[in-house]
Amino acid sequence: MKRKGYILEQIADPDNLRHAYWNAQTGKSAKKDVIAFREHLDSNLVMIRSRLLDGSYRFGNYHYFTIYDPKERVICAADFGERVVHHAIMNICAVDFENRQIPFSFACRKGKGTLAALKQAARYQKIYPWYLKLDVRKFFDSIDHAVLFSQLQRMYKDARFLNLLWRLIDSYHSIDGKGLPIGNLTSQYFANHYLSYSDKYLTEQLHQKAIVRYMDDVFLWAYDRDELIEKGQRFENYVQENLLLTLKPFVLNKSEHGLPALGFHLFPEETRLNASSRKRFAQKMKQYDIMLKNDAIKDTRCAQNILSMYGFIACAKHKGFARTIVKGFDAEGSNRVNRVIIYCLTI
């Protein structure tokens, strides 16, 4: 593909910045930093535009917090103004990243996502007797800045835009010269693109057919066990030498024994929630029960959240489990939340 130029002017376009603001504030309009930005919206957008165009815009005003869902992760979140810029960049550039993905990559893509990845993996589980699971150790913290930037240079020739991208990449370090902040919108696209080179290695050099990749979780299937072992070793060598990444130990098994993937356990004949997903689901349902009883959440918002949760587990054998969770609710909150849950159980 040809490298693209004249990108920075498109990103700094007033209409694009305003669109980016609306995208960034979606679902967060009541937060203090969003309200403060909105009170001086026009002047803030003019300032961002000016600094983007004159090259003085700087990233790095981060704050950190830890989540434990399902495992411990340190999230690095930019302030709201920077998030507007992230959205402004991706409004223009998302299509360029999308065009460099191949069909079996499912993260950060419209029309793809977790459920699509699971459905494709479930199909392969029925066809192939063996699977190999590959996972990058500390993926976001291990992404090499120089390697990533060289990849972006192959996409764009706008020097001012590339300087902006370098300042964004260089604003965060897990160790010197490495790491992307998990909380940034741009990080999700950059990280997914980083591994697109290994996707092409799998398909073009190893001629692997049955693949599912969701960010740094890579799953391969084959009829022959030794074929998977050889391809896994060659893939590991490639990412070590070319992407400077380290893989966790391989998980090689028969499909009939089940594939642990993305919060589920996939068998040839059925898909089940794994133990940690069941635990998180039960905890969240109890939280909504308490919030409803205390009028801490509106029924409509609760319904939206619960429907989203049910959408996540829709591909699994789950209805008996969900009914068991419902029985544990106290009466007052349950009467309200049950109406939502009963509806979910019928879809």
Put a short name on every predicted segment.
Residues 34, 181, 185, 265:
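Gly/Ser/Thr-rich beta-alpha loop segments that engage phosphate groups in nucleotides
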Residues 93-100, 202, 317-320:
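Short helix-capping/linker segments at secondary-structure and domain boundaries
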Residues 44, 51, 103-104, 109, ...:
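Conserved polymerase palm-domain catalytic core
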Residues 53, 94, 153, 200-203, ...:
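A general structural signal for alpha-helical elements within enzymatic catalytic domains
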Residues 2, 78, 83, 87, ...:
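Right-hand nucleic-acid polymerase module
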Residues 1-148, 156:
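Conserved two-metal-ion catalytic palm core of "right-hand" nucleic acid polymerases
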Residues 236-244:
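A common structural junction motif
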Residues 28, 179, 183, 259:
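Short glycine- and Lys/Arg-enriched binding-loop motifs that mark or flank ligand-binding interfaces
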